[in-house]
């Protein structure tokens, strides 16, 4: 056995396709690109999202509606079981931030009924749903507006 006589086993290496090199290759003439059109051209086929070939795009044909509430960027929901993470008896926006329940950019928070609360807390300066209010008061807590 010599290094110059080594060769891979028959059938173990696939022959690389060479498009556009004659009809016998199976990829002659059009080279597997089909006939005419944007994707058959060199550099073709890459168009931006929503582009419809010059036709008026659907996004522009439909009417505008609604808006994006900027208050939603500074508002958050707080669950009852997250209030348990706050140390102390008073729960407000600053204590929720210190406990890591809400992020620093939050200005408004609303307490919702999800989970349960087992200790008396005073909720100050937060919106509270009916169900959450009942659960907090049942645990001996109170809500201050």
Swiss-Prot record:
Keywords: Ribonucleoprotein, Ribosomal protein, RNA-binding, rRNA-binding. One of its GO terms (cellular component) is cytosolic large ribosomal subunit. Signal peptide: none annotated. Residues 1-52 are annotated as: Disordered. Gene3D superfamilies: 3.100.10.10. One of its GO terms (molecular function) is rRNA binding. GO terms for biological process: translation. Residues 21-35, 42-52 have a biased composition (Gly residues). Belongs to the universal ribosomal protein uL15 family. Binds to the 23S rRNA. Part of the 50S ribosomal subunit. HAMAP family: Ribosomal_uL15. This is Large ribosomal subunit protein uL15. The lineage of its organism: Bacteria, Pseudomonadati, Pseudomonadota, Gammaproteobacteria, Aeromonadales.
């Amino acid at each position: 056995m010599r290094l110059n006589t080594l060769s891979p086993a028959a059938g173990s290496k696939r022959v690389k396709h060479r498009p556009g090199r004659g009809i016998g290759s199976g990829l002659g003439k059009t080279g597997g690109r089909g006939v005419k059109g944007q994707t058959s051209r060199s550099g073709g086929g890459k168009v931006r999202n929503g582009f419809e070939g010059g036709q008026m795009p659907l996004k522009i044909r439909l009417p505008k509606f609604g808006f994006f509430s900027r208050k939603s960027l500074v508002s958050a929901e707080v669950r009852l079981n997250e209030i348990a993470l706050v140390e102390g008896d008073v729960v407000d926006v600053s204590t929720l931030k210190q406990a890591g329940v809400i992020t620093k950019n939050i200005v408004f928070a609303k307490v919702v009924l999800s989970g349960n609360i087992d200790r008396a807390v005073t909720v100050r300066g937060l919106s509270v749903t009916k169900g959450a209010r009942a659960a907090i008061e049942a645990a001996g807590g109170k809500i201050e507006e």
